[in-house]
Amino acid sequence: MDLTLFIFFLILLLAFANGTNDVSKAIATLVGSGIANYGTAIAWGTFWTMVGASASAFVASAMVKTFSSGFIEPGLVIPAVFAPAVLCGAILWVLFASKTGLPVSTTHALTGSLVGGGVLAFGLDGLIWSTVSKKIVLPLLLSPILSFGLSMLLHPLLAVITKRWEGLCVCIMPSHRALVTIDPQGGTRTLFQAGGIGMPVAAVPSQCDRAGLSGPTIGLDSLHWLSSGLASLARGTNDAPKIAAMLLLGGTMTTWPSPTWHILAFTGVALAMGIGSYWGGLRVTEVLAERVTKMNHAEGLSANLTTSSLVLLSGTFGLPVSTTHISSSAIIGIGLLRGISSLRWTTVRDIVLAWLITIPAAACLACAAYFLLSMALQTF
């Protein structure tokens, strides 16, 4: 098999593995707060993940550069087995974690594989350690701390707002060309209408019942859905370029030979992430939705807003972060606001251990794959 095609196959497999583990990070709050069932939430997260992964082809060139060549000393000859070994290390670890229900970071797995395989292939002097530390390790270490703190600061503010707006919704009425608010007592008030502002609309039902309204209704649940979609989109935008970059790591290509190859690579990654998300995302979603802490609607919204804002911001600067660490830290931070006893510490312990083990485990798997692939290449 042609080396480039073999690497592309492994890239698709890693994208699939990423989907099985990472789709949960943006949708677990929908299930945990009781807004959606698993099937609907996973389908929602899958769609926006694929949108984000596809869009990253046009906005994530800095991330591609970092993971394809930014940490290897220029001028080194990259062995043919290097990229396949790196991919195998990450694939094996992420699939194992998904099977056992552990939320782990594909970014950490790739980083561990790159460093482990890089040291074996080039020695300690072959890696640009300043790039590894500043552009990869530092953002990965700081992001969960920032997420933990931001969620604990953001949620009390959102809790005040949502308590004030509890039961309030906005009805969009195209036939009346109006936006109408309905309070929990059934009172109505026009936000906007062609004929006037602030006038009661008697035709609107006294209950905020979606089935009885003459137009779609927007409430707190709608904002939670939107925040989940945004977090899924951000995840796709952040993860897809790291995976696609492996095609430029030691294959027959070091740059995209044509726009067609560029689009093909990201389209393949987006589809594989979507397939993995939809058919394999249940197990890890169950862990984050039910086994860390209980959440209400406002808490779920706070966690998703924290996740989406940090992941999108990091992507703007081309900094790789772990959606896993950010979303899990946000959920844990919000759980602590309820009190220490509200967290299931055995689950938190397992999650933290999985975080700590991911980089060395992926590094060891990449080294083993490098050795076995080198032996196979010499044999055949």
Q: What positions do the PLM features span?
A:
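N-terminal signal-anchor module of multipass membrane proteins
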Residues: 2-55
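Alpha-helical transmembrane segments in multi-pass membrane proteins
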Residues: 7-14, 44-52, 56, 60, ...
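Membrane-interface alpha-helices at helix entry/exit sites of multi-pass transporters
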Residues: 34-47, 80, 258-263, 297-302, ...
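Structural signal for the N-terminal portions of transmembrane helices
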Residues: 127-145, 260-265, 344-360, 364
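Intrinsically disordered, low-complexity non-transmembrane regions of multi-pass membrane transporters
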Residues: 157-227, 341-342, 380
